[in-house]
Amino acid sequence: MADPEVCCFITKILCAHGGRMALDALLQEIALSEPQLCEVLQVAGPDRFVVLETGGEAGITRSVVATTRARVCRRKYCQRPCDNLHLCKLNLLGRCNYSQSERNLCKYSHEVLSEENFKVLKNHELSGLNKEELAVLLLQSDPFFMPEICKSYKGEGRQQICNQQPPCSRLHICDHFTRGNCRFPNCLRSHNLMDRKVLAIMREHGLNPDVVQNIQDICNSKHMQKNPPGPRAPSSHRRNMAYRARSKSRDRFFQGSQEFLASASASAERSCTPSPDQISHRASLEDAPVDDLTRKFTYLGSQDRARPPSGSSKATDLGGTSQAGTSQRFLENGSQEDLLHGNPGSTYLASNSTSAPNWKSLTSWTNDQGARRKTVFSPTLPAARSSLGSLQTPEAVTTRKGTGLLSSDYRIINGKSGTQDIQPGPLFNNNADGVATDITSTRSLNYKSTSSGHREISSPRIQDAGPASRDVQATGRIADDADPRVALVNDSLSDVTSTTSSRVDDHDSEEICLDHLCKGCPLNGSCSKVHFHLPYRWQMLIGKTWTDFEHMETIEKGYCNPGIHLCSVGSYTINFRVMSCDSFPIRRLSTPSSVTKPANSVFTTKWIWYWKNESGTWIQYGEEKDKRKNSNVDSSYLESLYQSCPRGVVPFQAGSRNYELSFQGMIQTNIASKTQKDVIRRPTFVPQWYVQQMKRGPDHQPAKTSSVSLTATFRPQEDFCFLSSKKYKLSEIHHLHPEYVRVSEHFKASMKNFKIEKIKKIENSELLDKFTWKKSQMKEEGKLLFYATSRAYVESICSNNFDSFLHETHENKYGKGIYFAKDAIYSHKNCPYDAKNVVMFVAQVLVGKFTEGNITYTSPPPQFDSCVDTRSNPSVFVIFQKDQVYPQYVIEYTEDKACVIS
């Protein structure tokens, strides 16, 4: 028997991270070795921990999902002895209509951790969980928390009584499957909780795709225990395979996980069925010989297509590149059509649970397939398809057919507000700067859904490897040279393709080299990263070659605007949502996210997060709009969480309202009203002139004309340096004024050998309002702290506050934030700029509750507001949210050298 305290602690950690973690990430949170942890998980069994494996040619990644046998009693009034929890499930999730003062009106108990409930939790070894952690665990373990299942639903392909108008709002899935007691290995009812319609209903009831994914994996595990795989019965004793509709990880289309991937030969012996979305009006798989299906399984192993991230628990889809698989294509009615010859549905490898100490490596099912892969796929594809494996919405297809977009002009098209003309130019760049971008290798690529509405390429890694891989965005799988569309494009664009384009089978990193951008890479030709003259790079896949676009700055400018998702380039249309140029995949290479690098890193990508209001306007998080209270989270905070947990859900507040933001679904949900808003993540635009200026040195003043043209066209640049709209007032204080005396004395306390030239007061009502609101929330007085920086940043700071992306110091050992000093001399000595061009800001800073910092921190630990160098008598304060800071004064000073008599 596993140690109850250890199991409870592991469950607590998992629930604090959304109910699921990669095994490697879990090992970092506990003081156990890997063999010890594996033994605990095995002894505890799948009723406590479901262990999943995602495998590929690069290796195996294991994930752990928390579950429990504890259940909530469904009776309104339970008078008899009961081993279940008695509580209000809506209150547990923070959604009960009765407030705390009205809890007596609710039919269910609001005492989550009552004495009776505590006994039940103790019996299930869960007494150490708090309310929030218990909510996570029960939500993915107890089917009582799921929406109602339709009682009229009889299964796919059978006569259904359910014909409600409007369509049924209940779940059409197997009720027994959710309870873990379905006795049919080939059940006629659907076991696919990741079906589009099911997900939509789940979302309406507050269950985001992350939670549904965990429920799917837990139910799959129970079903495998109930129906262990064995020798297949004769066909006469099996149900018609055409109507099977279960989802055992391999049947997931948008995400999924594979539990202990088996070999192809073993998998071929098990039933391999399509999901409910695929099987209507199709021939039975019984018609296809087993040997033929087995051969097709082996052919699908190592094609030039994507596989799910090895760091996640998503399904290894052997059918193609998208999470839906290239063996399917979505038609306008939402159905899917197979691209396999003689196969009426997609085929997936089956998998079995094995004991933790005996986790086995992948069987080599990917060998000897390259020469035969063309026999699996149809030689022709519909023109409406964006690429082989890149699915395209009917909206995108219809839009491209519109004659208004197929102009010779280069223009950016805003979906609702018309078009914005931009200078025309050739489609591709002949003279791209930098070495060839060898973005993919002979192994398959990894794809995952992104917050930008498309997919990203990521290299095989443990749970949360380098963030740069998340910023390389692309769709579609690698097209074969024999694709007839490639020849068509090559005929028309052969004279403009780049000579430095990269082959898809080259080996290289997806990350643009920061050293090359800043001061020159010391590794030169041996550097594994991409060398390019901009922190972003746009390319299009033609055949097996990634070709650079010309005028990348113009494409980037459109992409950075959250309201723009289509732009036309000559006779071609770029769709930022699906990352395609007509029927060809495109991608955006990028530098790493700014929150993952030290504060003094230059040219990292700063991502901005937006939500869409009722009028269709994209609002930046943390920004006040239409006199509404701004949210208590901003882009830097969200980006930090996204980089550490890209499948997570973030709770936050805006005024008195509570919300949840799902990274995977990119949806913001009002917890009370259940209304949802779209969310998007786009980078801050960095013009080429700024890159050149930073290479020359940050003290060089930029051309003022550039900022006018940029801010007039693109709203996302409000946080970008030098793009100020003069929304502040800077006034010099007279040297006899008491305010001048107070500030100067504070400055000279540590700067005795320096002379003050001027002290100017900053007045910015917008920044002051945000600071005042934050101050009222934290209920504390601010400290007067110092921050030395380049004179070139005065306008940016006065207008938009401090920014760790641009206004950096050499330090980062206490966290990746903004460094303020108690003594001015400390900030002066740590300023990385020429002393002749340095100014000193005096800021009001809300340090709040602080703890000792760490170089890995991108935000303060929970329950803390800032980080310091030492807790006893701190002299350095690291702030991660700029609303905790208000720049109040700026001091111009020079060194007062002593007179020397010779």
UniProtKB/Swiss-Prot annotation:
Residue positions of motif Nuclear localization signal: 69-76
InterPro entries, sorted: ARTD-AVP, Poly(ADP-ribose)pol_cat_dom, WH-like_DNA-bd_sf, WWE_dom, WWE_dom_sf, ZAP_HTH, Znf-CCCH_8, Znf_CCCH
Motif extent (Nuclear export signal): 285-292
Keyword RNA-binding assigned: yes
Gene Ontology BP, a term: negative regulation of viral genome replication
Region listing for N-terminal domain, in residue ranges: 2-254
Bias (Basic residues) ranges: 235-247
Entry GO CC: cytoplasm; cytosol; late endosome; lysosome; nucleus
GO MF terms, alphabetically ordered: cadherin binding; RNA binding; zinc ion binding
Residues passing through the membrane, by range: none
Quaternary data: Homodimer or homooligomer. Homooligomerization is essential for its antiviral activity. Interacts with EXOSC5. Interacts (via N-terminal domain) with DDX17 in an RNA-independent manner. Interacts with EXOSC3, EXOSC7, DCP2 and DCP1A. Interacts with PARN in an RNA-independent manner. Interacts with XRN1 in an RNA-dependent manner. Isoform 2 interacts (via zinc-fingers) with RIGI in an RNA-dependent manner. Interacts (via N-terminal domain) with DHX30 (via N-terminus) in an RNA-independent manner.
Task performed by this protein: Antiviral protein which inhibits the replication of viruses by recruiting the cellular RNA degradation machineries to degrade the viral mRNAs. Binds to a ZAP-responsive element (ZRE) present in the target viral mRNA, recruits cellular poly(A)-specific ribonuclease PARN to remove the poly(A) tail, and the 3'-5' exoribonuclease complex exosome to degrade the RNA body from the 3'-end. It also recruits the decapping complex DCP1-DCP2 through RNA helicase p72 (DDX17) to remove the cap structure of the viral mRNA to initiate its degradation from the 5'-end.
Name of this chain's protein: Zinc finger CCCH-type antiviral protein 1
